[in-house]
A protein has these predicted regions:
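Midchain, well-structured core segments that form catalytic/ion-binding scaffolds
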Residues: 102-105, 145, 152-365
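His/Asp/Glu-rich mid-to-C-terminal helical/loop segments that flank catalytic regions of hydrolases
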Residues: 157, 223-240, 269-272, 317-324, ...
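Acidic, glycine-rich active-site loops and adjacent beta-strand->loop/helix elements
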Residues: 76-78, 139-147, 169-172, 211, ...
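Zn-dependent metallopeptidase/amidohydrolase metal-coordination segment
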Residues: 7-11, 342-355, 363, 418-478
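Active-site metal-coordination/substrate-binding segment of hydrolases
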Residues: 64-146, 151-162, 202, 313-316, ...
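Active-site-adjacent substrate-binding region
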Residues: 232-248, 393, 401-444
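Acidic/His- and Gly-rich active-site-bordering loop/insert found
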Residues: 2-103
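A short beta-alpha structural unit
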Residues: 16-20, 264, 298-309, 348, ...
Length: 486
């Protein structure tokens, strides 16, 4: 199979086009310009707002003008992650895609099908006048991945739809009718620099090979967190030897499970062989723990040039204890929807910043607002007890399921008619923009669906090609069956 043969042709054509347009979160200027130019080229009413959101309207097919207006919605930004051995500048370089069996993936980077496939689907609908539909508005939002900025900034009256179809879900055959709310927290330690004693052995300890993945949608899989695993080894080493912590770094994004982490430490020269033995023992234990969930986990130890400075011992101890105690993973399962994670937390990243600051970023999610606040307070308490300062982002609301939704009934009937099986009705343990849309447009009737994606937010991200055709056929059938306005 070659890329030119992929079906539906229009969707894959536009997906390949937007893969040529850099679109990191908070740096979406190029894709915004691309969308506005697209709307103007096709002589469609196009507008933007101050946040960067773009709305393109397409009139109804003749004879369908009295149907309810449908908003098709996707976010334009993508998570920018790459493997360490890959040279790629997400601000300038296109995403290079390749076919692997029935899957489309990128070469060593995130693919950006989250949510580029939704954007491409909307463009294919806007460009094709043979498709039957009532009035359609295509909403493209910015910065979903790092702050839901576009959804937060959306003003009342910017769009006028009665129904919203969010195209940002990742399992074909599933219709989502609810999502978790979330909040981000930042803990900061201030440290003093101290001298590393002369003659100490300096080395880099690294954790790599983990799958990573989405901190909401994949949190129930029991995947390894590089920050937690590295900290386990550092904690035992700190207790056993006269260890100086010179550098620590792990994870990148608040909404991704940390795949890689490393630390540079210094210990007495006489202990270096024992340290290597310790790491071999620890690595064997950890690899056994994650043999099923994360079988490619690796630990490495490499000699480093001597470091003159390190983090003071008191701060190092408090940091390592806090990272050990900080919760990560599933905290509670839903009592209403079997198999749905209700509340979770992600120990996302550990970074050294200018001004002798160590910053730890975490994110908490829950479909229950009070539980979201509870888990966030738990995280705050752990870090404050260790002497860190803690701050929170604004957070965002969840989307409470409405099992009696009219558009849900239409979509479910359509799926059964087309494919002979029932679609699965679900809620998702991840933040969708839908909860914020309801704040501004409380009468919106919404569902979320999409083709099958795996490994999103990691370089392993891939899209199951046959599900794109099913998603497309389903979407077009839904548009045909939108009811008349009341």
């Amino acid at each position: 199979m070659e890329k030119k043969d992929l079906k539906p042709a229009g969707v894959f054509h536009y997906f390949e086009e937007i893969c040529q347009v850099p679109r990191p979160s908070k740096k979406e200027e190029k894709i915004i310009a691309f969308l506005k130019a697209f709307g103007e080229k096709h002589k469609l009413e196009t507008k933007g707002d101050e946040a960067g959101n773009v709305l393109i309207k397409k009139p109804a097919t003749p004879g369908m003008e009295n149907r309810k207006t449908v908003v098709l919605q996707s976010h334009v930004d993508m998570v920018c992650e790459k493997n360490n051995d890959v040279k790629h500048d997400f601000l300038t370089d296109p995403i290079e895609t390749e076919i692997d069996g029935e899957w489309l993936k990128a070469k060593g980077t995130t693919l950006g099908a989250d949510n580029g496939i939704g954007v491409a689907t909307e463009l294919a609908i806007l460009a094709d006048d043979s498709i039957e539909h009532g009035p359609v508005e295509c909403l493209f939002t910015v910065d979903e991945e790092t702050g839901l900025t576009g959804a937060f900034a959306l003003q009342e009256g910017f769009m006028s739809g009665d129904i919203l179809l969010n195209l940002d879900s990742e399992d074909e055959g599933e219709l989502f009718i609810g999502c978790a709310g979330g909040i981000d927290s930042v803990a900061e330690f201030t440290y003093k620099e101290v001298d590393v004693p002369a003659g100490y052995f300096c080395c880099k300890v690294q954790v790599k090979g983990l799958k990573g993945g989405h901190s909401g949608g994949d949190i129930h899989l029991g995947l390894g967190n590089a920050n937690k695993l590295l900290n386990r080894f550092l904690s035992q080493t700190f207790k056993k030897y006269d260890m100086y912590l010179c550098e620590i770094d792990g994870g990148n994004l608040r909404n991704a499970i940390a795949r890689e982490a490393h630390a540079v430490i210094a210990i007495p020269e006489a202990d270096k062989h024992a340290l290597r033995t310790d790491l071999n023992v620890f690595a064997a234990q950890a690899e056994a723990e994650y043999a099923v969930a994360d079988p490619d986990l690796q630990f490495t130890l490499e000699s480093e040039n001597p470091r003159a400075k390190a983090i003071d011992k008191d701060t190092s101890k408090r940091l390592l204890q806090a990272l050990y105690a900080a919760p990560h993973g599933v905290y509670a399962m839903s009592q209403d929807i079997p198999g749905l994670v209700e509340t979770s937390t992600n120990l996302a990243s550990v970074k050294m910043k200018p001004g002798n600051i160590i910053r730890i970023e975490t994110s908490q999610r829950s479909s229950i607002e009070s539980s979201k606040q509870d888990i966030a307070t738990m995280v705050r308490t752990v870090f404050e007890m260790a002497g860190a300062s803690v701050s929170f982002g604004d957070g965002y609301p969840g989307w409470k399921p409405n099992p009696h939704s009219e558009i849900l009934e239409i979509a479910a009937e359509s799926y059964k008619r087309l494919f002979g099986v029932d679609a699965k009705i679900k809620a998702i343990h991840a933040g969708l923009e839908c909860g914020l849309f309801l704040d501004k447009y409380p009468s919106l009737d919404m569902i979320s669906f999409g083709p099958t994606l795996q490994g999103v937010h990691s370089p392993d991200e891939r899209m199951l090609i046959p599900t794109v055709q099913k998603f497309w056929d389903h979407l077009l059938d839904i548009l045909k069956h939108i009811p008349a306005k009341n």
